[in-house]
Each structure stands twice: as structure tokens, then as C-alpha cells.
Swiss-Prot record:
Coiled-coil regions, chain positions: 758-867
UniProt source species: Mus musculus
Residues engaged in binding Zn(2+): C426, C429, C450, C461
Family annotation (InterPro entries): HATPase_C_sf, MORC_ATPase, Morc_S5, Znf_CW
Main localization (coarse): nucleus
Keywords: Coiled coil, Metal-binding, Nucleus, Zinc, Zinc-finger
GO cellular component, one term: nucleoplasm
MF terms in GO: ATP hydrolysis activity; methylated histone binding; zinc ion binding
Keyword Iron-sulfur attributed: no
Gene: Morc4
Domain remark text: The CW-TYPE zinc finger mediates its binding to trimethylated histone H3K4me3.
Top-rank taxon: Eukaryota
Region called Disordered, residue ranges: 474-510, 527-546, 599-649, 718-766
Name under which the protein is recorded: MORC family CW-type zinc finger protein 4
Zinc fingers (CW-type) by residue: 417-469
Length: 928
């Protein structure tokens, strides 16, 4: 069958010759492309797995223009046929939108609340539904209208259609009566004849299964079967799950470790639990809730990495960790726009593990910079995709080597791991909350609410979700980067040189970090023979190494600015004026970061009082050229000797040693106590070291030695042996220690407290300036919080207004489509009037026939009346009786033809019936 458009052929059309130069191409009588019904089946074959087809139907409910909160997947039996049902409480569709959804290639999805739609090609519902079964019915309501649409291969085969036909019937949601359009009547007839519902009442009852005033329900039957005749999906094995039929959980040996195929390959419940990177809706599978999870937050021994694609300037975060549920499953989970595309993709050492390399390691990445394939089961094989896979392989290998090199690490533990962080979704507001501490997710209730949260800040559903610190660090705004670049240019390059050291000891606890906001940075301090026991024990404990975090470097910038306000020459002058204790050169000269620790004698300052004063910063102890040969043998850790409150904390360098020793200032990063969480304890510390110009030019060597436990013990042993060989170098400390602990503490407390008036005045001005700065900072923080609250308020108002605008625009479009001015509505009215006219003509013809019969009866009666006119009374009575019966029959006839005619109180002996009959005949122009 050929379809044409427009008028006869003209120039530029087939058979009409070639178009002239400069002429406009014509579309008249050009053949239209038609779509064969067989395309429905061939299009569905793009999904190699049935779960991929189910994911397409779920994606339609997740899209931002639908915003469904709950999706129900169930199996129902209708007329002894198993049917798959998908029901959501989204926004629903108008008949016009339903027609576009059942057509091919139409997609008008929008971005809402920074959430991107998953669909791209406008083909997901057709391919997904036809992959699961041959026939599908769609029921949708949007608050004003109800609509039913049929997409059926069986229907197209029965009518031998040459193109894809989709019957759609609209109903009024108020009275559930059909809205008459030009195709509503034949569409309803087709649905009732070729679907599993044969009456309109059963069809409309399906709308009652949709919760609320809006939503959509999809019903699929004639489930696809395998070659052996069995259904592709197994509904009987597990009453709360849908499994793939005849699926064997195959096992194979990989590097001596038994590896099972993931549960997501054959269990729909497991597949739905990880289908979305951050789920935003509840899924009920066969009347039981699916425990959705953020797989990136359900791993143990988590490490983060970044990857910068070549096609975009944004950095992409990669998460690596060990699976807590299945120790023998591994691979990279690759998402796109929050949707899982490739699951358990093997990379790096996981491709061909010989000794179990990479087994148990799960990687998570969101590849929004890649383009998914047509069926959303893979990515297009481009250069960017190959570079991404290679980068994942390198980073996964590095993660595996780092974890294996750690002590007491078990790749395959005997007991179940607990995630580093436990996140749970509120059943009411659907927000994700992080629980403090390490909590086993299996111990949480099936329905969890915000008021269960032990954290007092997140006990209400109105509180926004907790922002992830690592996301803020990896995706910093350009404004912050520009500010940082400007600050770097403003620094005096001739005064200090900076070096960045990674892998320092762990950051201080939360309360210490919070106190750093109200403290200044002290000057450098050098070890002396007077050591307090608590400080010595603190300095001997080997610190742990942590990974690098850029956030620590950002927040430490404000302390660097405070130090930058005081010139270097002024600090030198203050240092030379301060009395110093002799320095023990026999001790180790390697650089070490020392945590600020102070012993408080009885009756003196307590830790609470000290929190308002200056705190001792971490230190880096330099190495001298003269003692370089001794450091190979002597590595005993130095310690600090704290002074009193009035004295500047720590000892300063003498003037004669200043040209030989580098001046080091370590800056400790801090965060606000509101924003610091458990991740900050795991985060790294970045030390920014300033080296005086004179010392840097002298060529004094700088060495950083990591503190491993075994190496540290060996250094102590070598130091003790060197001291025994050189007794004179340690005579002073030994003599000091012989006086006893009381003498040592007394000397530590009675350090000289000489301060010049100039220094005291400078210190006072600095303290006042710092107090003003802190007060301004607190004021600015309060204003920022108020502005943030106001911004959130107006943001919510804006979103509400935007939602109302979308609603009004949708209603306006629907009103235009179904208004009385629309041609479709006028056509519907014309069809109704035309049908009434046909019925009236038929009734008129029937009345004419009945009137002819009545006239013939009257003629017979008249003849009988004339023939029986005789004086005999019996004949007259019989004639009157017959006339009465005839009048009764005529009255019955009139009553059947005209139901509104009342003839109950009329006497049949009179001529009233004759008069009424004559009036009816005259009114219908029959006598003419």
C-alpha cells in the first residue's frame, strides 16, 4: 500500500522530472515510509536479557518529568494468563503524550533539579515491553483525564495491518465516561475485542489499582517463552522474586578462588537493588520492598581516585572497595546518569587472575562523558571508552597492590565485612542518611525513618541530605580556583619557598580540629634535653600514613595568611632576643611532624583554659650538615619542651645557627566543627613548609623520612649503640635525668620568661588583631548561614513556582487539545449529531409502516361498520365491541410508538382515540 501526501505531481517529484535550479523541493505525492508490525519484534531483540527490558520500564518512572516515588512490580493472573504489571504514582500522561510514548522516536524529557533524564532515543518502552511479552496495555491518569492505549503484536497480526496501529481511548476522570473523538469508538472496540478485557467495566477497573489521582499502570501478557516452550521468567520458585528460568549459578575457579556469577544476573530483586547509583524511589517487587543501596557507600576499605576525561574538563570520581556481601564477586560498576549500564566489568588484574588478584574488589564510576549504546547495556566503543577502561585498569591495580602490601589484610576474610560508612534511605522523605560509627546494614529495620537517626541534626525529614566532602573537594568551583591563583600571585616570592609534603601522620581528632579555628600559629620549636615524659612518649609513637586530600590544603590557607602578616625579619629579631637552652646535637636530625602535646602540672592551666590560648603547631625538625653522618646511626625521635602560658610556646633558634638551619613552619588544616565528619579523620594532612632565603641558598639538605614501625625500632637500636660508643655526647642528658623527675619538671616549669617591652607590645597588638579577625569571621559565618537559609527558602519557592508553571502549561496544552474550538472536538460533535440523525430516520420509517397498518385496519373497520348497519341490536353490540377493541389496540400502538403519551384515563367508547390518532398523523405529515 502506497501512501501519498498532497496534490498531483509537480516539479521535483518522482515522475515529474528534475527540480529546476532554485526551486523549492516539493513533498507532494512523495511516498511516506511505513513501519511494518514485524518491527516490534525485531526492535525488542536489542535486549539480550529480560532484566534490561524491565529496567527500561523502570527508567520511565525515574525520569525527572515523572518523579514517581513508588513503583510496584507484580505478577497477576487475568483469565488464566500470567501478566506482568508495573504501577507507579508519577504524574501520568495525557492522551496526546500517551500517543507519543507509543510512537517511535519521540522524546521531550527535560532536566529538573539538576537530574538528567535517562532516556535518549524515545524507544525504551516499545523495545522493553515487547521484549517481555507480545501484548501490552497502558493505563494512565493525570488528574483530569484517563487514557488507555494498546500496543499489541497479536492485534496487528489478526487484522493483518500494514503499519503499526495503536488504539487509544480517553475517558473523563470525573465520571469515567468516554470522551468521544474521531477514533475513540473504533479504538475502544479494538481494545475490547483483542485484549484480555472484553467489557468496559473490567477495563476501567484497572485505574483503581493506580494509587492516588495520578499515575501509570502497564500490563503485559503473552510472556515470552524459550524454545522449549517454558516461560522465560520464573514466577513460582520464589514468591517474592522474579527469576530467570533455567538459570544455573555457574561456578568457576579463578586463581584458586571459586567465583560465582553475580546474583544480579538471575534475580530481579538483586538487580533492582543496584540499578541506580543513588536511588530516589521505592521499588516493591511482588508486594515486598526492595532494599536499594548506594553501592559506592556499601563497600569496605574504600579509597577514592579521580579521572579526567579528554572530552570534558570535569573530574570524575572513582570509588574502589571490597564487597561486604559477596567476597568472590568483583568488577567495575559503570553508571550513566545514575543508571547502571555495565555491571561487574573486569579491568586490570581482574581479567586473568592467577592467584586471586582483584577478587572481591568493586569499582564504581559514573561515566556521564560516555555515550551509552542503543539498548543501554553497553557503551559505544570509542576512543574515550578505551582510555577510560585503561585508566580503570591502572588505578585498580594500584589499589590492589596498596591493600595487599598492608599488614594483617585479608583479601577473603572468613567473616562478613562491615562497610566503612552505612547509609540508609528514609521511607518517608526518601533522603539518604549516614549513620555514625560502623553499623551492619543487615541489622537495620526494613522501614527506616529519619527520627531513627542517632545524629540529632538529621532527625527530621526537612533537613537536607548531608553533602559528601569529597565531592566538594573534587568538583571545586572556578571561582575558588581563581581566588587561589590570585592569592598565590600576591605572596612575596623572595621571602619564602614552599614545599608540599604528602603522607604525613593522621589528622587530629574532631574536637582538636574545631579548636584550631580560634587559635593562632606559633613559631618553630627545636628539641632540647629537657623532655617531659608525656611528650617523649607522644613523640615515640609511630604515626600512621594517610592518603592525600586536597581539602586540607584549602582550609589551611587562612592560617598561612596569618603568618604572612608578620615579616620574616621581625620573627628573626624576636628569636634572637629570646633566651634559649642548649641544643643537643647528638639527637636525630631528620624531619618529623610532632603533634602538639603539653603536660599540665597540678594547680596550673587545664586543657580547658589552654584551649583559648595559643596551641603548639606540628613541627618539622631539620637535619644539619655537621651531623649528617651521625643520622645514619642515630634516629631517636626528638620531642618538645613546653613552656608557660606567658612565654611564646616553644624555643626559638639562636642567631648563630640561623644561617645553617632551615626555618620551617607547618600549617595544620582545620574545618568547622559542623562540617567535620568521620571522613575527615580518614583524610590526609598537607604540610606547607616555608624555607628562609638565606638558609635555602646555603644548600642545607632537607630529608623527609616516613615513620614505619620496624624502621623506627631499628633506628632506636642504632642510636643506643652509638650513644654507648660516644658517652660524651649524652653526658648532659644523663646528668639531667639523674636529678629525678621532680627536678626535671621544675626546670621545665621555671624556664626564663624574659620579654622585651617591644615584644610584649607586638604580641598584644597581634592578639587584639587576631581577636578582631576572629570576631569578624564569626560574624561573617553567621551572615553566611542566614544567607544560606534565605537562599534555600527562595530556592524552594522557585522550584515550587516552576512546578506550578509546568502544571499550568500542561493543563493549557490539554485544554487546547480538548477545547471546544479544536477541530477534533467539533468532529466528535458532528459524529454524534450524525448518528442521532440516522436513528431518527430509522424511527420515522418505522412509524410510517405502522401508520400504514393502522390505516388498513381503519378501512376494514369502516367497511365492517357499514355492512353491519341493521336494526338488529346484537349486530350493533358486536360492532361496538370490535370498535372498542380496535381503539384499545390503536392506543397500545400509539403508546409503543410514543412512550410519553398517556392514555390511561381515556374512554374507548368515545372518539378520543380517533382524535389523538389523527393529531399524531397530522404532526408527522403522514396525511399529506
Amino acid at each position: 500500500m502506497l501512501l501519498y501526501r498532497g496534490a498531483p505531481a509537480g516539479p521535483g517529484t518522482p515522475g515529474g522530472g528534475l527540480a529546476r535550479a532554485g526551486s523549492v523541493p516539493q513533498a507532494f505525492r512523495i511516498r511516506l515510509s511505513t513501519m511494518s508490525p514485524r518491527y516490534l519484534q525485531s526492535n525488542s531483540s536489542s535486549h539480550t536479557r529480560p532484566f534490561s527490558a524491565i529496567a527500561e520500564l523502570l527508567d520511565n518512572a525515574v525520569d525527572p518529568d515523572v518523579s514517581a516515588r513508588t513503583v510496584f512490580i507484580d505478577v497477576e493472573e487475568v483469565k488464566k494468563k500470567p501478566c506482568l504489571t508495573f504501577t507507579d504514582d508519577g504524574c501520568g500522561m495525557t492522551p496526546h503524550k500517551l500517543h507519543r510514548m507509543l510512537s517511535f522516536g519521540f522524546t521531550d524529557k527535560v532536566i529538573k533539579k539538576s537530574q538528567r533524564p535517562i532516556g535518549v532515543f524515545g524507544n525504551g518502552f516499545k523495545s522493553g515491553s515487547m521484549r517481555l511479552g507480545k501484548d501490552a496495555l497502558v493505563f494512565t491518569k493525570n488528574g483530569n483525564t484517563l487514557a488507555v492505549g494498546l500496543l499489541s503484536q497479536t492485534y496487528l497480526e489478526c487484522i493483518q495491518a500494514q503499519a503499526v496501529i495503536v488504539p487509544i481511548v480517553p475517558f473523563s476522570q470525573q465520571n469515567k465516561k468516554m470522551i468521544v473523538t474521531e477514533d475513540s469508538l473504533p479504538s475502544l472496540e479494538a481494545i475490547l475485542n483483542y485484549s484480555i478485557f472484553n467489557c468496559e467495566k473490567d477495563l476501567l477497573s484497572q485505574f483503581d489499582a493506580i494509587p492516588g489521582k495520578k499515575g501509570t499502570r502497564v500490563l503485559i501478557w503473552n510472556i515470552r517463552r524459550n524454545k522449549d516452550g517454558k516461560s522465560e521468567l520464573d514466577f513460582d520458585t520464589d514468591q517474592y522474586d522474579i527469576l530467570v528460568s533455567d538459570f544455573d549459578a555457574e561456578e568457576k575457579e579463578i586463581g584458586g578462588v571459586t567465583s560465582e556469577l553475580p546474583e544480579t544476573e538471575y534475580s530481579l530483586r538483586a538487580f533492582c537493588s543496584i540499578l541506580y547509583m543513588k536511588p530516589r524511589m521505592k521499588i516493591f517487587l511482588r508486594q515486598k520492598k526492595v532494599t536499594t543501596q548506594m553501592i559506592a557507600k556499601s563497600l569496605a576499605n574504600v579509597e577514592y581516585d579521580i579521572y579526567k576525561p579528554t572530552s570534558t574538563n570535569k573530574q570524575v570520581r572513582i570509588t574502589f572497595g571490597f564487597s561486604c556481601k559477596y567476597h568472590n564477586q568483583f568488577g567495575v560498576m559503570m553508571y550513566h546518569n545514575n543508571r547502571l549500564i555495565k555491571a561487574f566489568e573486569k579491568a586490570g588484574c581482574q581479567l586473568k587472575p592467577t592467584c586471586g588478584e582483584g577478587v572481591g574488589v568493586i569499582g564504581v564510576i559514573e561515566c556521564n562523558f560516555l555515550k551509552p549504546a542503543y539498548n543501554k547495556q553497553d557503551f559505544e566503543y570509542t576512543k574515550e571508552y578505551r582510555l577510560t577502561i585503561n585508566a580503570l585498569a591502572r588505578k585498580l591495580n594500584a589499589y590492589w597492590k596498596e591493600k595487599i602490601s598492608q599488614e594483617n589484610f585479608e583479601p577473603l576474610p572468613t567473616s562478613r565485612r562491615i562497610p566503612d560508612q552505612t547509609w540508609v534511605q528514609c521511607d518517608e522523605c526518601l533522603k539518604w542518611r549516614r549513620l555514625p560509627g560502623m553499623v551492619d546494614p543487615s541489622t537495620l529495620p526494613a522501614r527506616w525513618f529519619c527520627y531513627y537517626n542517632p545524629h540529632p541534626k538529621f532527625k527530621r525529614c526537612s533537613v537536607p541530605e548531608e553533602q559528601e566532602r569529597i565531592d566538594e573537594d573534587l568538583h571545586r568551583s572556578k571561582a575558588k580556583q581563581q581566588v587561589e591563583a590570585a592569592e598565590k600571585k600576591q605572596k612575596p616570592m623572595e621571602s619564602d619557598k614552599y614545599q608540599v609534603f604528602s603522607n604525613p601522620p593522621k589528622t587530629p581528632p574532631l574536637q582538636d580540629m574545631a579548636e584550631l579555628n580560634d587559635k593562632t600559629i606559633g613559631y618553630e620549636q627545636i628539641n632540647s634535653p629537657s623532655l617531659l615524659p608525656s611528650v617523649r612518649e607522644e613523640s615515640r609513637s609511630p604515626p600512621r600514613l594517610k592518603s592525600l586530600d586536597s581539602s586540607a590544603f584549602q582550609i589551611s590557607r587562612k592560617y598561612k595568611l596569618i603568618l604572612g602578616e608578620e615579616p620574616v625579619e621581625k620573627r628573626r629579631k624576636i628569636q634572637t632576643e629570646m633566651p634559649l637552652s642548649p641544643i643537643d646535637y647528638s639527637m636525630s636530625g631528620f624531619y618529623r611532624r610532632v603533634e602538639a602535646a603539653t603536660a599540665y602540672p597540678e594547680g596550673e592551666n587545664s586543657p580547658d583554659k589552654c584551649s583559648s590560648e595559643r596551641s603548639t603547631p606540628p613541627h618539622l625538625i631539620p637535619e644539619y650538615p655537621e651531623s649528617n653522618k651521625h643520622t645514619e646511626e642515630n634516629r631517636e625521635a626528638p620531642a618538645l619542651c613546653p613552656g608557660s602560658q606567658d612565654q611564646d610556646q616553644g624555643f626559638l633558634l639562636p642567631e648563630e645557627l640561623e644561617d645553617q638551619m632551615p626555618k620551617l613552619v607547618a600549617e595544620e588544616s582545620n574545618r568547622s566543627s559542623e562540617n567535620i565528619d568521620k571522613d575527615m579523620n580518614k583524610g590526609p594532612f598537607v604540610a606547607v613548609v616555608g624555607v628562609a632565603k638565606g638558609v635555602a641558598d646555603s644548600g642545607a639538605p632537607i630529608q623527609l623520612v616516613p615513620f614505619n614501625r620496624e624502621e623506627f625500632v631499628g633506628k632506636r637500636k642504632r642510636a643506643e649503640s652509638w650513644k654507648r660508643a660516644n658517652p660524651y655526647s649524652s653526658a648532659a642528658p644523663a646528668a639531667t635525668a639523674g636529678k629525678g623527675k621532680d627536678c626535671q619538671d621544675s626546670r621545665s616549669r621555671n624556664m626564663p620568661k624574659i620579654k622585651t617591652p617591644k615584644e610584649s607590645e607586638e604580641l598584644k597588638r597581634t592578639t587584639e588583631k587576631l581577636e578582631r579577625v576572629l570576631a569578624e569571621r564569626n560574624l561573617f559565618q553567621q551572615k553566611v548561614e542566614e544567607l544560606e537559609q534565605e537562599k534555600n527558602h527562595w530556592h524552594s519557592e522557585y522550584k515550587k513556582a516552576q512546578h506550578e508553571l509546568v502544571t499550568y502549561s500542561t493543563q493549557e496544552t490539554e485544554g487546547i487539545y480538548w477545547s471546544k474550538k479544536h477541530m477534533g472536538y467539533r468532529q466528535a460533535e458532528f459524529q454524534i449529531l450524525k448518528a442521532e440523525l440516522e436513528r431518527t430516520k430509522e424511527e420515522k420509517q418505522e412509524l410510517k409502516e405502522k401508520l400504514k397498518e393502522t390505516e388498513s385496519h381503519l378501512e376494514v373497520l369502516q367497511k365492517a361498520q357499514v355492512s353491519f348497519r341493521n336494526p338488529e341490536g346484537d349486530d350493533l353490540e358486536r360492532a361496538l365491541a370490535r370498535l372498542t377493541r380496535l381503539r384499545v389496540h390503536v392506543s397500545y400502538l400509539l403508546t409503543s410508538v410514543l412512550p410519553h403519551l398517556e392514555l390511561r384515563e381515556i374512554g374507548y367508547d368515545s372518539e378520543q382515540v380517533d382524535g389523538i390518532l389523527y393529531t399524531v398523523l397530522e404532526a408527522n405529515h403522514i396525511l399529506d
